[in-house]
Amino acid sequence: MRRFLGRAVVALPLGLVAGLAPARADWLPQTEPPRWSELRQRELPGEGWRFMEAMRNDQVEAAEYLRFPTAVGETVELEAGLLLRRSGQPDWTSRVLPMRAVCRDGRMERKAADGQWTPYPGRAGTAVKVRWICSQP
């Protein structure tokens, strides 16, 4: 899967251009399948999660979520959620990370433990997903 929420984890489309991008985004999140909905309710804390996408390959199965998008200047801050299970492992791992979409640049950043924003590795499709995120608040 694509890198999302950390070194050994998967990337969010999640994670979008508020006021700087066209009003129309070229991408929309997938509809959450019932299987992922049940797992999310069991594994991700709290309410308000929006399913973004899921993937599966020989090494990992994962789904990405976001919630609470809030425009802050030329960015959109949000919580990114990840459900992850590595091949051969019976248990799921969930992570919630503070992230932001840098609308003007079409990229994502992750908030480090010291409160500083650091670049988050992008992947194919990140910029279009950033446009969608930035159109939400």
Which residue ranges define each predicted feature?
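N-terminal secretory-pathway/extracellular module detecting exported/lumenal segments
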Residues: A23-P137
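Positively charged n-region of N-terminal signal peptides that target proteins for export
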Residues: M1-F4
